Amino acid sequence: MLDPKILRQNLEHVVEKLRRRGFEMDSDTFLQLENKRKEAQLAIQSFQTKRNQLSKTIGMAKSKGENPEPLMAEVSQLNDELKQEEANFETIQKAFSDFQLAIPNLPHDSVPDGKSENDNREIRQWGAPPGFDFTPKDHTVLGERDNQLDFEAAAKLSGARFVVLRGSLARAHRALAQFMLDLHTDQHGYEEVYVPYLVHEECLYGTGQLPKFREEQFQVAGDRNFFLVPTGEVPLVNLARDEIIEAPALPKKWVAQTPCFRSEAGSYGKDVRGMIRQHQFQKVELVQLVQPENSYQTLEEITRQAEKVLQLLALPYRVVELCAGDLGFAAAKTYDLEVWLPSQNKYREISSCSNCEDFQARRIQARWRNPKTGKPELLHTLNGSGLAVGRTLVAVMENYQQADGHIRVPDALKSYMGGVDYF
């Protein structure tokens, strides 16, 4: 959520920055709501002032032995009118809050202009795509051996965009997740956290999936108002809800492996085959809560930490800076990591690392105590995929495939795979 002070004091600037990301803010509606809010506030203050004055007059009348009943009746009438005005104010505040919740974050000044992923800027590449003396196969074909990648079984259980992994592929999937967790906890200093996979609706509001992306969420039937997590970012960031963290305890660095559940409502016809776009997939998520002045340095750090996974697995990739029009709803700046897939002869997204500044923190009131002032201030929240496990498995399968269809085990993964060289 944007700072209401910025909206009130520098509305034109906000409108222009939002226009960079293709969002047209209805400034007329904002001004109407703001005027109604001010009018309701003034009315409430006026009623309260009159009531206080009458209360004093009643006290004076009683002290003089005068009949206070007419004045008390007037106070009662004022109280009724005050309650009505307070209810009106709450209605206006709700409309104002709903209006704010629909506004995305402002892009950072360094974010390049652009309308879509076609305008994203490549920052760097690492590694060279492998050369094959045979035509490289798609991961779905490679997975047919011993039926280790079984989409038919998954369809029988759950329908399209699910997968059943068996044997060596299931083990490789588990090994990759464990390798990522070990790297981030042992070398990058993250605290591992196990979190619920069902969260309250307010958690999704807190991180920005709601209200805009409701159709992309899986909501659990019943009266508990649970949602399946679309990313580990949701429970991790919400751990700081309504917390005030002391400065020496910062930064908070949390990592979790969770399943992610997404309806892919806007992805009809995209990546219908294989494991690239699924309703359920595993992801290792990195989250940091930091002091505001450190957040852009931290964004570079998280990006490098996600890159380290790909480097240790010797998977060629590139880093792309998202243009303003391709930013996620809550992000002020984002880097995507895209891994090379030989069968597609192109790079595909495998990680997204974002600085949300105080956008999420304002929604969940995640704060730190500034030792200089002694007062609580909003934190900056950052998140990054470290990495998407299924897509990493796809990249390993395709980049390490052999002519006979077997997959060579990356050196970094051998100890997690029982020391075997191929699977």
Curated annotation (Swiss-Prot):
Pathway annotation: Aminoacyl-tRNA biosynthesis; selenocysteinyl-tRNA(Sec) biosynthesis; L-seryl-tRNA(Sec) from L-serine and tRNA(Sec): step 1/1
The reaction(s) this protein catalyses: tRNA(Ser) + L-serine + ATP = L-seryl-tRNA(Ser) + AMP + diphosphate + H(+); tRNA(Sec) + L-serine + ATP = L-seryl-tRNA(Sec) + AMP + diphosphate + H(+)
GO BP term, example: seryl-tRNA aminoacylation
PROSITE patterns for this protein: AA_TRNA_LIGASE_II
Domain of life: Bacteria
Compartments in which it is found: Cytoplasm
InterPro entries: aa-tRNA-synt_IIb, aa-tRNA-synth_II, aa-tRNA-synth_II/BPL/LPL, Ser-tRNA-ligase_type_1, Ser-tRNA-synth_1_N, SerRS_1_N_sf, SerRS_core, tRNA-bd_arm
Keywords in alphabetical order: Aminoacyl-tRNA synthetase, ATP-binding, Cytoplasm, Ligase, Nucleotide-binding, Protein biosynthesis
SUPFAM superfamilies for the chain: Class II aaRS and biotin synthetases (SSF55681), tRNA-binding arm (SSF46589)
EC id: 6.1.1.11
Keyword RNA-binding: no
Family under the similarity heading: Belongs to the class-II aminoacyl-tRNA synthetase family. Type-1 seryl-tRNA synthetase subfamily.
Record-linked HAMAP family: Ser_tRNA_synth_type1
Protein known as: Serine--tRNA ligase
